[in-house]
Amino acid sequence: DSMCLLDLLDRWCRERDGRVVAAHFNHQLRGAEADRDETFVRDWCAAHDIAFVSSSGDVRGLMEREGLSLEEAARRLRYDFLRQEAEKLGQHIKIYTAHHADDNAETILFNLIRGTGVAGLTGMAYQQNGICRPLLDVTREELAAYAAARHIPHVEDTTNADPGAAARNFLRLEVMPRLRQINPRAVE
């Protein structure tokens, strides 16, 4: 997903004499696999003349200190890093994330399960607090087709295939496929 977004943004910026900066946060939760992911993105950016910045943080430490879930601690550190990098680049810099329609459907369902009420039905905003999510209308399947057509490589986070690794994974791997059986357009 993020590699597709990086390709799209890079193409868009080059057509307008702009530039994109790829920012990668290593959560240090998956050992050598996480380091491999960072190296993969760094090398791809170098091969495509895209600026690259990265950082890492102690997600488990923040989780324990502040009583956060693993996902929330990781999100907080990641977005803090992204905001710091954006501030370094200038006042009008935007942060783009590769959240897509499937992610948004999962978010809405997750919000309902947590009891957020009507406010949770809106899902993620296309743009909020300097964060832009241009792919919210694009499905995971459409992104995979784009990646294949453009020969965009990617690496898999193996924890994404484990429904027990996080509540969101359970929704993605167990619940969403069942919802699609009821309504194939459940994500739309």
Model-derived regions, located:
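Core alpha/beta nucleotide-donor-binding catalytic domains of modification enzymes
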Residues: 1-177
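An accessory alpha-helical subdomain
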Residues: 179-188
